[in-house]
C-alpha cells in the first residue's frame, strides 16, 4: 500500500536554540578549514552498465572548459585513491546512482574554478590544502553525514554525474543582537518516526526521511519577530533528491506562534549578555537618562489628565486653556523621548513601558508533507491550509461558528496519521478519493494515463502573471537548450510555482539537469555546478559573484521585476516560430492586454491566507473534474482560442461550503456517455451562444489610454439580467460610489483609485466596469427584493447588498466592501492553461512530428541502443544527421542545438526501448495524430483509440478512511 503523503514534519526552533547558536559560533571561529570544505561539491562519475544512453556529441558540454582542483581523501567509507578525472568511467559498479547512504566509492572532493564575469580566464578559488590520511576526522564524518544530494545528470560515454553539496556554516557575529540573529532550524517532529518505519510491514511503500528537510523549510534560517499582531503565514514547495536520484517533493506552511515563556527567558538572558559586552557606560547612562525623563513626563501627563477629569466631574463647562497646553506639551515630550529611545532599543531591558510592552515575540513553525508524487501538490497544499487554519483560527475572517468550533477541536495528530497511513494513493484515473479534513472535504485524484501528466495540478498562472510573454519565451528557449536558469523572488512560494511551470511547458521533453526550485542559503555553492540546472532562490541573498560563468549559458530571471538577464550565447528559435508562439500565447493568456493585470506575483503565492481568508483550489474542492480538452483544442485555429470550454468561479472562502453544491458550476461536457438529463441540459446551456446565456455581457469600449491603476472602469448600457447558478467567491474591493452622485463634468468618479469612465449613449443609465485579477466586474443593482434571492457574497458569506458587483465571465458575486479580497484569477476568461499547453504542444509537434521517419529499429532495447562507430552519424537506430539536416531546412539551424541536448536523447531513447502501446509513448504519438486528423478521425485519417478510451477515465468517487478522532466522536454521538 502506498499513501498520498510519505511523511509529515514539523520544523522550527528547538528549546536550546540559544546554546546551539553559541556553540556553533565558537566552532566556526575555531575551525576555518571546516568552512572551506563545506562549500565544495562532490562529483561521483561512474559508468552505468545495464542502462546505456545515447551520446550526442563527441565533446560534451559538461566537460568543456571546466577545470577541477582535486582534493583527495582516503578512508574506509570516504573516497578512493586519486585518479585522472576522465578515468572514473572504468568503474565496475553496476548501479552507481543507487548507493548506500554512506558509500562514497569512486568520488573525489572537488573545488570548482570560478570564472570572472569580466574576463574569460579562470582563477582558482583559495581553499586550504588537505593532506590524505587513513581515517576521516570528526569534522569529515560530520560533513559526510550532513551532505545534501542535489541531483544526477548524464554525460558522454555513458557517464552519470551525481552532485552532492555540503551546507555552508551559519555566519554569526558576536556583535549581532539576539533579535537580529538567524538561528538554524531543527526537526521538532516527524511522522512516521524512524522506529515506526522499521516496524511497518514490507507491503507499505514509503521512502526514507531526509535529514536536511528543515533547511529547505527555512531556506534563510529563522528569525524572531516582535509584533503586536501575528505575522503573515506563508507557504512554499520544494524538491529533494535522494542518493539514488529519486525525487521527493515537499510542501510546507509556515505559521507564526507565540514564543513560549521558557524560550523568552533564555533569550532575555542572552540579551543581557549582549548588553554587557556591546554597550559602553556612556550609552547606558544616556539610555537611562532618557528613560527617566520619559517616566517623568508620563507621570506628569497622568496627573494633568486626572485634574481635567475632576473638573469635568464638578460640572465645569469652561476648559482651562493652560491645562490643555500643558497636556499637549507632555504628549509631545513623550513622543520625542520615545523616538530618541527607539534606536537604543537593544541597549535597554526588554520590557519598557510604552516602548516594548504589549508586543509579542513570534517564532515560525513549518508544517509540511513529503511525497514521491509531484502531481498531488494542489491537494497537499489545500490539506495543509485547512489543518493549519486550526492553529490561527481566531485570526481568520468569515468562518462560520460551527466550523470554527470544529477547527478549534481538530486533533492534528489524528489527521496526520490519517493522511500518511490511512488514505491510499489514488490510481491514475478510475476514481477520486473524498478525504475528510476537519469541517471540509477535499478530493484527491491523479490524471489518467491518456492525459498529459499533471496538466490540472500544475498552476501556470503565476508565471504568466509575473512575466511578460517575451520573457517567458526566453526562459523556454533556455530550458530547451539546457542552459542554467536561476529564478529570483522575495517570496518562496513564487519560486516553486515558476520552476514547476517551466518544466511543465517542456512536454513531451523531460528536463535532465539539476532541479532545485528552492535553494537554501547554505547551499549557495550549488550555483557552481558545471551542468544545466533550474534553481530558485531568494533575491536578497543572491549575488552574481556566486555564479561562475562557463560554456553553459546562464539566464537570471527576477520574478518580482519582470526582468530576464542572459549571460553567454543562447541559441534562439527562428523568427517565424517565435512570432507564432508569441501571437498564440497572447490569445490564450490575454490577462495583461485585455484585463489589465499588472506584472507581479499574485497575492495567493505570497500568503497562505490572502486577506485572512481561506482560499482553496477548484481542483480539489469539487467532485466534478474539468475535461481534458487538449485533443480537441489541437484541431482549433488560433482564432478559436477565445472560446471558453467551461465557466468556473474561484473558491475565495472555502468555509462557504460551495463544494457541497457542484450543480452551481459550469463544466465542460463529461466524457462518460451515461450522463444524466440535468448534466446534458447544463452542457447544452454552456454550448449555447453567449447572448443566450443568463449573464450580461454588453459591449465594452476599451479606454484609449489606459492608466497603470489596478482598477479600471468603463461605462456601457445597463442590463438588469443577472446570471443564475453562478459560483460566488469571497474577496473584497474598495467601495465604488454611485455615478449619479459623484460624476463630474469630465466624466469621472472619485473612488479612491484611478477611474476611467467612457461616455455612453445619451439617455442610457451608466454602469461601471472594474477589472480585478482578470475579473470583469459589473455593478449590479437589485431592482426588486426577489432579485438575487438566496445569493451570498463570495467572500463574507453575507447576503448580497442592494448594490454589488458580478463578474461577466465567471459569475463571481461580491459585495462592494470586499472587492479587494479578490486574489484568484478569472479562468479561463483571462487565462486558459489548456490553450497554453496546446500552444507549446503544437510547437513540439511541428518540430518532432516526423521523428518516426528516422527510427530504423523502433523496438530496439536500450542495452543495444548506443553509438555505432563509423555509422555515418547514426545514433543507435536514429538517423541524427538526416533528421537535423531535414529539420534545419524548415525551422532553422537551431535544430542542431536541440538535437544535441540530453532531453532529446531521452525522448528518442524512450521510443527505442518502450513499446508503441506504452502510455509514455502512445500519448504524444496520438496527440500528434490528433493534430494531423484535425481532432477527429476522418475518412483517410488514423484513429486515436488511446485518447478516446473512456475506461481509463475517472468513473466513481470513493470515501477515504476518516481520522480516528472523528470515529470516536461519531461513536459518542
From Swiss-Prot:
Gene3D superfamilies cross-referenced by the UniProt entry: 3.30.450.200, 3.40.50.11500
Instruction: Kindly list the positions at which Phosphoserine occurs in this protein.
Output: 134, 318, 726
Q: Main subcellular localization, coarse class?
A: cytoplasm
Q: Where is this region: Disordered?
A: 69-136, 693-713, 729-750
Cross-referenced InterPro entries: cDENN_dom, dDENN_dom, DENN_C, DENN_Domain_GEFs, Tripartite_DENN, uDENN_dom
Protein name per Swiss-Prot or TrEMBL: DENN domain-containing protein C297.05
- Could you name the Gene Ontology cellular component terms for this entry? cytoplasmic vesicle; cytosol; nucleus
Q: What Gene Ontology molecular-function terms does this entry list?
A: diacylglycerol binding; guanyl-nucleotide exchange factor activity
What keywords are annotated for this sequence in UniProt? Cytoplasm, Nucleus, Phosphoprotein
Q: What organism is the protein native to?
A: Schizosaccharomyces pombe (strain 972 / ATCC 24843)
What single Pfam family name could you report for this chain, choosing any that match?
Answer: DENN
Q: Where is the dDENN domain?
A: 588-919
- Any idea where this protein resides? Cytoplasm; Nucleus
Task: Point to the regions of Polar residues compositional bias.
Answer: 69-79, 739-750
Tell me which residues make up the cDENN domain: 449-586
GO biological process terms, alphabetically, are: regulation of Rab protein signal transduction; vesicle-mediated transport
Sequence ranges assigned to domain uDENN in this UniProt record: 169-427
The cross-references to PROSITE patterns, in alphabetical order and at most eight, read: DENN
